């Protein structure tokens, strides 16, 4: 039986890794915004951040709160509807549920910092629509499903907004905004898991249909190019008032290109690992992002580390690190 063949019995699982590496790891990684103390963040916001930094952080956070619902719907409606296997469906439902936790948590940050006077940084509408069209497949054709799943998993979950995650997390380098930093750490780990397992699901589809990888290639490359354009414009928007201490727009652009290459390889296009030319030194200036969020360069977190990070007292003392 294949991925699209219904199995009435709950077990035995035919694809057990979607339970062990997907559902179980996400369940073990459960967290809530109520675990995050924001007292020091409020003090930092009122006393230590300048107006340019407040503009940047406030607009990023407002934008985040508007993006999570669509991601949740993709997992709980599209993926659950396409794949009848229990182990895949329950993983997708768990992922979708976790995205609602993100939405609530971002809203909590916005309310705590009183960000109602800021305008959300969002992806440029025309380019975003082109990308959304590549994800918005609703039919039952395996080629359409594969394209949509690949683009969503690799780029929507694995690249989109990572520049914003890095900007917010960069304040940890200065021992500021620890509550926001803790939430970014947990959010990045969740997104890394979602992207990793979605890419695996695409590869498994390709393993069962030898033509899929090649049939999807052109549209996936097109989506990668569109994502680079989206993130580049988004970075320009974030840094319209100039760079901030600890991070630069130029480094972020190369970081995103490198990450997009890595996701193309993770989908199975091993020959596209250098598709987008990037400055290795500039991209390497963001290696601290992988270190502080618990991952390692070239490898998403869940591939290499345990997942017991849901405890409220887990936070590091960044003065000790830096």
Where are these regions (language model features)?
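Non-heme di-metal
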Residues: 1-322
């Amino acid at each position: 039986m294949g991925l699209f063949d219904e199995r009435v019995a709950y077990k035995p699982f035919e694809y057990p890794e979607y339970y062990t590496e997907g559902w179980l790891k996400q369940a073990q990684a459960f967290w809530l915004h109520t675990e995050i103390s924001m007292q020091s963040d409020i003090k930092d916001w009122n006393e230590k951040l300048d107006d340019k930094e407040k503009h940047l952080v406030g607009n990023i956070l407002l934008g985040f709160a508007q993006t999570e619902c669509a991601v949740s719907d993709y997992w709980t409606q599209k993926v659950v509807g396409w794949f009848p296997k229990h182990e895949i469906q329950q993983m997708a439902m768990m992922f979708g549920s976790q995205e609602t936790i993100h939405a609530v948590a971002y809203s909590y940050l916005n309310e705590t910092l009183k960000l109602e006077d800021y305008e959300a940084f969002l992806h440029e509408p025309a380019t975003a629509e082109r990308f959304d069209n590549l994800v918005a497949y609703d039919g039952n054709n395996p080629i359409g499903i594969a394209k949509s799943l690949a683009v969503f998993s690799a780029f929507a979950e694995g690249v989109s907004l990572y520049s914003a995650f890095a900007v917010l997390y960069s304040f940890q380098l200065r021992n500021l905004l620890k509550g926001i930093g803790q939430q970014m750490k947990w959010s990045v780990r969740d997104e890394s898991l979602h992207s990793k397992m979605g890419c695996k699901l695409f590869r498994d589809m390709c393993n069962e249909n030898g033509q899929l990888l090649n049939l999807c290639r052109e549209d996936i490359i097109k989506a990668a190019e569109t994502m680079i354009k989206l993130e580049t414009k988004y970075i320009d928007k974030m840094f319209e008032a100039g760079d901030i201490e600890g991070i630069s727009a130029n480094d972020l652009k190369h970081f995103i290109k490198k990450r997009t290459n890595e996701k193309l390889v993770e989908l199975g296009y091993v020959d596209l690992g250098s598709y987008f030319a990037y400055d290795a030194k500039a991209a390497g200036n963001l290696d601290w992002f992988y270190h502080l969020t618990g991952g390692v360069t070239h490898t998403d977190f869940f591939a290499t580390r345990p997942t017991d990070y849901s405890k409220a007292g887990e936070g590091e003392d960044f003065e000790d690190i830096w």
